[in-house]
Regions:
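Bacterial N-terminal signal peptides that target proteins for export
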Residues: 1-8
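Hydrophobic helical h-region of N-terminal Sec-dependent signal peptides
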Residues: 9-14
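C-terminal motif of bacterial Sec signal peptides marking the signal peptidase cleavage site
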Residues: 16-19
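Bacterial signal peptide processing site
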Residues: 21-24
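N-proximal, solvent-exposed amphipathic alpha-helical segments enriched in charged/polar residues
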Residues: 30-32, 36-67
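Short, non-transmembrane amphipathic alpha-helical segments
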Residues: 51-57, 87-109
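Short edge beta-strands and adjacent turn/loop segments
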Residues: 59-82, 116
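C-terminal low-complexity, charged extensions that often adopt amphipathic alpha-helices
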Residues: 99-156
């Protein structure tokens, strides 16, 4: 009888030890050191720095004199001033190449809109200057909506 009681207590103790052991779950994945985050910052100052970086990258495209960029959310609006004498047939290739350069320079962007239309480029420059002076993005939304209406995405 005592032997059966000891076995029963031993089994109960063994069951309690196994049942109360914490589950072994894998650790959540972490970004490796030096890895890049997957989302853009929300701080407008940081977004302005990234916009300047992608504008410099777009300006490296052949036959582009100057580029201006604005970022809202995960969308970049890029305006290109082309050198004189560029034919209309070349502009699509130039815009595509600039969009590819921008996307390579900043892979966190989901959409890149590129234009060579002088009026739209002026509007983008106006918004970029306003943001650089510290104006809130909300005060420039009407202008951005008009820019977006005029543009077609070149790279998704």
């Amino acid at each position: 009888m005592k032997k059966g009681l000891h076995i029963l207590l031993l089994l109960a103790l063994l069951f309690a030890t196994v049942a109360c052991t914490p589950a072994r779950k894998p650790a959540p994945p972490t970004v490796p050191p030096g890895g890049s985050p997957t989302t853009l910052p929300t701080n407008q100052t940081e977004l302005n720095k990234i916009a300047k970086k992608i504008a410099r990258e777009a300006a490296k495209t052949e036959k582009v004199k100057r580029a201006t960029a604005v970022i809202t959310g995960s969308t970049a609006y890029v305006g290109l001033d082309l050198v004189a004498g560029v034919e209309k047939s070349e502009t699509d290739r130039i815009k595509e190449e600039a969009a590819n350069r921008v996307k390579s320079a900043e892979p966190r962007l989901k959409r890149v809109y590129v234009t060579t239309d002088a009026d739209t480029v002026t509007r983008i420059r106006h918004v970029a200057e306003g943001l650089a002076k510290g104006r809130p993005l909300s005060s420039l939304m009407r202008e951005l909506d008009e820019i977006k209406r005029r543009m077609v995405p070149k790279r998704k």
